[in-house]
Each structure stands twice: as C-alpha cells, then as structure tokens.
Amino acid sequence: SRSIDLLKHRYLKNIKENLELFVGIELEYPVANLEGDATDVEVIKHLFRYLVSALDFTVEKVDDFGTPIQLVNPVSRDAILFEVSYTTIEFAFGKAETIQEVEERFSIYMEAIQKKLAESNHAIVGCGIHPNWDKNENCPVDFPRYRMLMDYLNLSSNVTESDLHHFPEYGAFICGSQVQLDVSKSNYLRVINAFTQIESVKSYLFANSEFTGADWDTKISRDIFWEESMHGIYPENVGVNARLFKD
C-alpha cells in the first residue's frame, strides 16, 4: 500500500550498505548523597561546570537559567547530560567500532566525576532506581522537553478506572541503558527479530531496578513504571514486538 511504501522510504532509505559497522551506547546513572539524604542538585550543577575544563568538553545545551545541562566532546562526540532530572546523569557515547574503546573513555570520565563528587559526599551509583528517590524533589530539568515529559506523565491523575500506578514522577528517578547497532538492508529484519527474542531474557539477567515504594516483588520495576503509566496507555509504546517479522 501507499502508506507502507512511505514508511519504508522514511525508515529504510538511510540504511547504508557499508562495511564499516559502529555501535552506539547510552548509560544512565543516579547521583546519590552517600549520607542517605536528598541529592544536592547544586553539587551536580557545579560538577557539569567543572567537567568543561577537566575533560575538555564544551557546553552544548543550557537550561532556562543558563546552567549547562549537556556537554559534548568535540573529538569523540561523547555527551554527558542530565536525563529528565538533575539527579540522573547520562553518558551518550559517540559512534565507536568496539565496546572496549567506549569502556576506556567511560573509565576516564567516571574517575574524574567520582573524584569530584566525593568532595561533597556524593557519588554515581549503579542502580536502576535512584536509592533516595523518596527524598529527592523529583523535578524535571528546567528545559521545555523535560517539563513536557513530566507534565504528560502527570496526566495519569486524570485517568479514571485504570490500573495506572501512582508514581507519575518516576521519570525523574529511573535509569536505563541503550545500545544501537548499525544494520544493513540485508540483515535488519534478522537483527530486529533476534532482539525481540532475547529482550525478556536480558531484562531478567540484568535486572537492577528494585523499587521500595510499592509491593511489586520484582527487580525489574522499570517495566511496571512504563507499562502502567501514560506511556502504556497505547500498548504499542511498551513491551517488545508481538511477533517476528518476515518482511
């Protein structure tokens, strides 16, 4: 049909038959106050200003008050940014040929960041849910995109007779990771189908999002946060593909 042809043109035309294949990696982490109190967002904002000189990054985006919220390395194109809230830091790495080279750069960034945060008794921690989520304000970064997201999630309070959870602010305290792989026109369907089949296994093997605010009895509460929120109002927005694709 005409609509299918348009979709194929939109999404498949940019797939290049290139022997050079790259990987893209994004990692999100909470920044916690090691005394168990709320994260001091001023500490994190100061960290971003510090990283500009410490790691030779440049400021790519600022919030409504001029505070740097996204930094980029002009050579590697690695970015360090706030993800939704000032208590979550994301590392969005530029394209790389191997995971190992990303790991090498990540280690350099983490060493500098953890050393600076330690001066204020804060640290990046490897949790899928911010350990002090109930102490933090859980407000969005002062930037239109993040305010829009949080406003949308808060619409759940207007949805009656539903099974939506009561934590619309979850966008400010959950973390995740993403990996993007280059594909070709000859293998993209095989890659999509492969990830569809391993996704549920992967989520259990690497589960680290246990939530203390509800009796959910799972270490992958991220699924509940997404599926039983405004994101899950439309089933197509959550979960994995319902079937394997042949064409």
Question: What do the PLM-derived regions correspond to, one by one?
Answer:
Residues S1-F167, F173:
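Terminal catalytic/cofactor-binding subdomain
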Residues I124-D247:
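Loop-rich catalytic cores of soluble enzymes, especially ATP-dependent carboxylate-amine ligases
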